[in-house]
From Swiss-Prot:
Its EC number is 1.5.98.1. Pathway: One-carbon metabolism; methanogenesis from CO(2); 5,10-methylene-5,6,7,8-tetrahydromethanopterin from 5,10-methenyl-5,6,7,8-tetrahydromethanopterin (coenzyme F420 route): step 1/1. It comes from the Archaea. Keywords: Methanogenesis, One-carbon metabolism, Oxidoreductase. This is F420-dependent methylenetetrahydromethanopterin dehydrogenase. It is an enzyme of class 1 (oxidoreductase). InterPro entries: MTD, MTD_sf. Belongs to the MTD family. GO terms for molecular function: ferredoxin hydrogenase activity; methylenetetrahydromethanopterin dehydrogenase activity. It holds the Pfam family MTD. Gene3D superfamilies: 6.10.140.120, F420-dependent methylenetetrahydromethanopterin dehydrogenase (MTD) (3.40.50.10830). Catalyzes the reversible reduction of methenyl-H(4)MPT(+) to methylene-H(4)MPT. It comes from Methanosarcina mazei (strain ATCC BAA-159 / DSM 3647 / Goe1 / Go1 / JCM 11833 / OCM 88) (Methanosarcina frisia). The gene is mtd.
Length: 279
């Protein structure tokens, strides 16, 4: 009999992927063999917020996923220090430099770095709650349709299966993935090459958003420059979401949408035609 697997998610701040990462292994709430709990610090991700995650250790997770923007920032760094004695996977939009990622691996952490999870235009002059939610909805369209959700789901399932089979602690093989657009789109299961090309374009656009929004968030001072630049970044994200939708519509029109639901026992099933059963 396989072990019940406790999977903990620590959400510090917010990425696009933060919205669903704790749901993607049990999409219809019918999977047996796993229990999921989430500790969130809201929009903030300071060292003081990281310190509060210590109490989550009482739940005794078999492995933990820490998701946050910029894993090299002080808050996420403090969280890693707290959780270094538990198998831990870092999910973040950075650092993107190879040396920094290798340092995570040397310290025993798994990681999935997502340069395609875009930086929001987080300036009071531009961003309110409605704009924030709209941007995240656009980001989720790209992350879901274009392969990012499935990539992460597959990697978390691999670690879950190891725990269920009796592995634990340092014996677990954790992912070490830099998820560039070309890698992500290969997980989306597109049958039509034009659909795949639209999805790849959407991922490249999502990656570009951070390059546009970074100056608006951290460098520009004049209100016109800040607002124009942040608005441009959000327009790129909206256009990327439209391309992602177009890609899925092509697959739907050909009845070739790739679906990979979980069986009750956690096995991943597959189907393509709308009216066929997943097997």
């Amino acid at each position: 009999m396989k072990k019940m697997v406790n999977i903990g998610f620590i959400k510090m701040g917010n990425l696009g992927m933060s919205q669903v990462i704790n749901l993607i292994q049990d999409e219809i709430a019918a999977r047996e063999g796993i229990t999921v709990r989430v500790f969130g610090t809201g929009a903030k991700m300071a060292p003081a917020d990281a310190a509060d995650t210590e109490s989550f250790k009482q739940w005794n997770a078999d492995f933990v996923v820490i998701i946050s923007p910029n894993a090299a920032a002080p808050g996420p760094t403090a969280a890693r220090e707290i959780w270094k004695d538990v198998p831990c996977i870092i999910v973040s939009d950075g650092p993107t430099k190879k040396e920094a990622r290798e340092a995570f691996e040397q310290e025993g952490f798994g990681y999935i770095i997502l340069p395609v999870d875009p930086l929001i235009g987080a300036k009071r002059e531009f961003l309110d709650s409605v704009e924030m939610a709209s941007f995240n909805a656009d980001a989720m369209k790209v992350l879901s349709i274009c392969g990012v959700v499935r990539l992460i789901q597959e990697e978390l399932d691999k670690v879950t299966e190891q725990v269920a089979s009796g592995k634990s602690g340092k014996d677990l093989e954790l992912p070490h993935i830099f998820a560039k657009p070309e890698k992500c789109v290969e997980h989306a299961g597109f049958a039509n090459p034009y659909a795949k090309s639209k999805a790849l374009a959407a991922l490249h656009m999502a990656e570009k958003v951070a390059q546009v929004n970074f100056p608006a968030c951290f460098m520009l001072k004049e209100i016109e420059q800040v607002c124009l630049t942040a608005a441009a970044g959000h327009e790129i994200m909206g256009a990327a979401a439209q391309l992602a939708n177009q890609a899925r519509e092509i697959e739907k029109s050909n009845d070739t949408v790739s679906r990979m639901p979980h069986a009750k026992n956690g096995a991943v099933l597959k189907k393509v035609r709308l009216y066929e059963k997943p097997e």
